[in-house]
Amino acid sequence: MPRLCSSRSGALLLALLLQASMEVRGWCLESSQCQDLTTESNLLACIRACKPDLSAETPVFPGNGDEQPLTENPRKYVMGHFRWDRFGRRNGSSSSGVGGAAQKREEEVAVGEGPGPRGDDAETGPREDKRSYSMEHFRWGKPVGKKRRPVKVYPNGAEDESAQAFPLEFKRELTGERLEQARGPEAQAESAAARAELEYGLVAEAEAEAAEKKDSGPYKMEHFRWGSPPKDKRYGGFMTSEKSQTPLVTLFKNAIIKNAHKKGQ
């Protein structure tokens, strides 16, 4: 019984080994060493005879022995269909992975260190061109800044500086001050006094208007449509006019007299 069990297990092991390749299995079945598999020695001899051809036909690799090795770099195989994987080369000739990136950096450094003066203009030029190329079709691609206005050229340099430093609303004051400086100190004193009187007059007028508003009485809502309704529409039209208004006692007396007169009749 033990021999039969060992022969059966050996036959199963041999069958599993021979399933890997049809050519190897056919050669082993035709050989004389594999004709009699009843004994353990014949079984081991058959396995030893078939093992070299089996390893030659289907080489065993570490890890997944049943799979063939990848013919290409895994990263290139997976990412080669993306346009940014080629690093600017045509037909995928650039090396993928870290080597391609390092090669590209070396090329950029070599171009930067080439002959010719290096300055800020040389560095910022390509970047600005690249940005305008990529963002020119968007309306927000260009940065929003102040509108460019035509530069006014003045014959005098001082006028040009004052026009650029101060807005339009201060130009009159600047011209007035220049005229006063040209006249002399007496003219400056007179103009200062005139300004003080003008300011004092404006303040006095504002205070007078405020006092008149306070003395005029309670606040009236004349700017609202319900502030002052017409007299004929007050109280729901009960009081139509001032002439028809009579004391309430007189109305009651007249009503009593009319009722008594009707009862007497």
From Swiss-Prot:
The modification Pyrrolidone carboxylic acid (Glu) is found at E173. Residues 106-129 form a propeptide. Specific enzymatic cleavages at paired basic residues yield the different active peptides. Residues 1-26 form the signal peptide. Glycans are attached at T71, N91. The modification Phenylalanine amide is found at F87. Keywords: Acetylation, Amidation, Cleavage on pair of basic residues, Disulfide bond, Endorphin, Glycoprotein, Hormone, Phosphoprotein, Pyrrolidone carboxylic acid, Secreted, Signal, Sulfation. The modification Sulfotyrosine is found at Y200. GO terms for molecular function: G protein-coupled receptor binding; hormone activity; type 1 melanocortin receptor binding; type 3 melanocortin receptor binding; type 4 melanocortin receptor binding. InterPro entries: Mcrtin_ACTH_cent, Melanocortin_N, Opioid_neuropept, PMOC, POMC-derived_peptides. The modification Valine amide is found at V144. The modification Phosphoserine is found at S162. Belongs to the POMC family. PANTHER family: PRO-OPIOMELANOCORTIN (PTHR11416:SF7). This is Pro-opiomelanocortin. It comes from Bos taurus (Bovine). The lineage of its organism: Eukaryota, Metazoa, Chordata, Craniata, Vertebrata.
